[in-house]
Amino acid sequence: MAGFIQRRKLDLLLAIFSNLQYGSLTVTLPDGSTRVFDGARPGPSADVQFHSMDAVARLISDGKMGFCEAVMDGEIDSSSMSCLIELAVMHDEYLTKQMAANAWRRISLRLFHGLRRNSKFGSARNIAYHYDLGNDFYSSWLDSTMTYSSAVYDRDSDDLSTAQRNKYRNLADLADIQPGDHVLEIGCGWGGFAKYAVEERGARVTGITISKEQHDFARKRLADAGLSDRAEVKLIDYRDLEGRFDKIVSIEMFEAVGQAYWGTYFEAISSLLKDGGRAALQAITIEDDAFDEYVRDPDFIQRYIFPGGMLPSMPRLERPVEDAGLKLMESNGFGLHYARTLAEWRDRFNAAWPGLAKDKFDMRFKRMWELYLSYCEGGFRAGMIDVKQLLFVHNRPTGG
């Protein structure tokens, strides 16, 4: 009976693959045999290897999450995971219908996500889960700017450090940072943008973070550069900060705010921004057509990488922005730049792995991080997600 059920699930999987509409897929089955499926429309060429019948069963029974967990466990592999993810995203609606996770699994994932709400306590816990892996971990594969957000490649020849500084420049231009401006950076990371804004724009910067690891690193970095008199880093939640600032910058911190707190976040920006000020944000967004399913069924990233995370779609931001008395003035998307950034990070992560493996990280962690970077790259290449630089100003007079 068990053998019959396994064969039935394999037949079902192959039937699903036979409806490929885009690109091509080469499938290697547990017995070593290979099947090739070609779509009628252009798309990426990808491959996938199933190392056990259990992997087939997990994909059929648990859908996207089953696939991701099977990859983490070494039961499914691909020579180009980002291409496989891109191909899957291009068939997302069909695959979701054919391989939906079972009801209990979906409920458990929703409960986990719900328990990771970004209250002040929850935010600190969620941020620590990801960023307190250790500064040594991140410094081993990030570039010299220690920047963990999408770069901007002005030229094909730009290396990662140059492209990260391009991003800093674009955000500083968008915010119109001038010499003497007091700039607030919400989610200052390891201090890369703060250092740039002081050295290159003559600004005074207050950076805030709720990661103790990042706080300590950024303070030392700015002190070592002789910038402590013009740049300060505070370990504080954005909801507890007081004061008024000429300009505000926030780089890919919004994804950690959580939908329940979007209004609170924009209200904080509105109250912290001086009259006539400008707030420049860099944020990852998701297509609005995919948003409801994304909210309903938390994904691999929310479960294993960024607990409590939530990508916005642009239409869903309109109400909280308006209610906070703000107005969106510019929106510039550059998703393919993020795809390239992620590919470079993955190469650098793999190059650094021998040293990381000697520390506290095992092969399951390695496969999880490779999947995370490939998962995001594929999403950007397929256009399901984007990264945007956004400019906000007050839409009404504010007191002060």
Locate predicted features:
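A short glycine-rich, Lys/Arg-flanked "PGG" loop and its adjoining helix->strand segment in the class I
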Residues: G263-G276
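Conserved class I S-adenosyl-L-methionine
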Residues: P179-G187
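Substrate-binding/catalytic lobe of Class I Rossmann-like enzymes that use SAM or dcSAM, i.e.
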Residues: I284-Q389, V393-G400
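Conserved SAM-binding loop
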Residues: A218-R219
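Conserved SAM-binding loop of SAM-dependent methyltransferases across substrates and taxa
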Residues: W190-R201
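Conserved beta-strand signature within the Rossmann-like core of class I S-adenosyl-L-methionine
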Residues: G276-I284
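Feature captures hydrophobic
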Residues: M1-Q164, N170
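A short acidic, Gly/Pro-enriched loop at the edge of an enzyme's catalytic core
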Residues: R239-I248
